[in-house]
Amino acid sequence: MQRLVLVLILVLLPLACGAQQRVELWTYHFSPPFLLENAQGLSHAFVELLNNDPGNHNRFRFELVELPRKRVDVRLARKHPGVLLWATPSFFTAAQVANGKWSQPLLIDQQDFVSLPDAPFEYEGPESLHGLVLGGVLGHRYAELEADIASKAITRQDVQTDLQNIQKLLSGRINTLLIPRSTLLYYRKELQLGELYVSATPLYQFARHLLINGAIGEAVTRYLDGFLDALPNNPEWQILLYQYGLEPIASEQ
């Protein structure tokens, strides 16, 4: 009898130890470098980094969930347990993040004005864009410029993607474009773009954090805290930053 009990323990123990907590990682950033074709991009790679981390000990199975921003807002409001990737505190209301906990910044990003080197544009406030054609992305709101765009002092032409804007700039159809520095760095590395002029003054700067939302559990919260504290010195994270051209904007905190 004792021998049978021992055998059962040896059989069942690995199954019990192998039970994993599923943790959703949400993203509403669908542009490079965060999402690429064929399940590639920084978001997928970050999930793999968590799942393969030795400190995880197979306790947690992180899964990427791609959501439009409105559905993210619903999950936050309902206190749904999960982790929001690459989020910026100023882009959310206090009520939306009342049940969440912010990590330290992972990336220090900004909205850059990019132009051709033979016709460089330097941003000095909305008035400096008067009479120019600005390339924007559909659905993006540039608060500081909205009044001048509405009055048609600034001509804004929208496209679906940042890459389309770059192509329009290179063909001379717009004077300047707005693009996140993270996306610009990726395309510079991936497409080996020639010299482009980047305004010394961006439209604005913003930090990208993780937002741990809802009752996700003390164990996973404690694990993520330790993982993120060590992230700046994690060689696998450094490889990802190099791969996507993001070393210049990586936070050292």
Predicted segment positions?
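Extracytoplasmic small-molecule ligand-binding "clamshell" domains
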Residues: 20-97, 136, 158
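Periplasmic-binding protein-like
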Residues: 28-31, 108-112, 189-225, 248-253
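Bilobed "Venus flytrap"/periplasmic-binding protein-like clamshell domains
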Residues: 30-33, 37-49, 116-151, 182
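Extended ligand-binding regions for polar small-molecule ligands
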Residues: 44-54, 117-120, 132-133, 210-248
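Ligand-binding clefts/hinges and TM-proximal coupling segments of bilobed small-molecule sensing domains
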Residues: 58-61, 140-151, 195, 228-253
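Acidic, polar ligand-binding/catalytic clefts
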Residues: 64-128, 142, 200-203
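Short helices/loops that flank or line small-molecule/ion binding pockets
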Residues: 66, 70-83, 128, 162-183, ...
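A ligand-binding cleft/hinge motif common to bilobed small-molecule-binding domains
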Residues: 85-97, 175-204
